Amino acid sequence: MVITINNKEIEVLEGETLIEVARRAGFRVPSMCYAKEAKHKSSCMVCVVRNSVSGQMIPSCSTYPVEGMRIETDSEEVSRLRALSLELLLSDHRADCEAPCTLVCTQGLDVERMLYLYDAGRYGEARSLLAAVFPLPAVGCDTCKAPCEKACRRGTVDKAVEIRAIIKELAGRVDLPVEDVYHVVDKRDKNVFISRLGRFTMKEKEWLKETTSAPSGCLHCACGGKADCKLRLYATEAGIKRPRYEVSSMLPVKEKIHVKDQMWFEPAKCIRCGLCVYNSENGFTFKNRGFGMQVVIPEESKTNVKKELAGLCPTGALYLVD
């Protein structure tokens, strides 16, 4: 069987779906709910393509080729529908890609990462991160107006984290060796998509006050899975800088469920693609139906989940910590 993709004739191999044919031919087709050699069901519509013969827009991850198809993967109409699909997914994705404190730091310091290392008792690493930005023991905070503390989400709950005091504490620890393992990364690239989680409800504020136990008081807003997040990657490629629609998800923000070992699950970041459900035996499952549907992990099923499952998650909802 031969079909045409972007005016190029391609012979179809037995059992291939459109997305597999297109990718084998070198065409880039994004996808969120599809992973090669994994069980899946089409739901995201990010992989949509157009059959110019019928005029139909079809999900390429679950559609099998038919003789005579003429497929478009990169037309303006296809790109527009993919962008809309991404924006709808983002309305269900309640999370920060980057911590506000890091985004506003005038020195380019990854403030949230430093606080994470500090709270984990990894003071040498935290000081090494500072050394990549400041000529220790001197720091640039004395003349700074502390935009990091003004942007701190903890400040909307009760009191902002005393970031400058922690920086000065670490800078003064001359007993801690500095390793050249960090470099400054500008996280303020205006072309990169940045998700925002929105405002905390009063109930969430009370819950955060009660459950946040980090020595610094930091809520650790930055997403632990942002480096491998397809949602952020494709949103950036589509030219989406900020979500068009308000976040409609009411799942508890910052709820982190320990699955097992190094694996964690954050329901508020989940787009309900189902990959973790379809590819775990008596593990993750769906709860409820329609707009209220959620992906959950029953307590008694946690031991059945394999760590490789985290690699299937297209967002930072399911991830491994170092």
Model-derived segments and spans:
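Ferredoxin-type iron-sulfur electron-transfer modules and their immediate structural context
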Residues: 1-312, 316-320
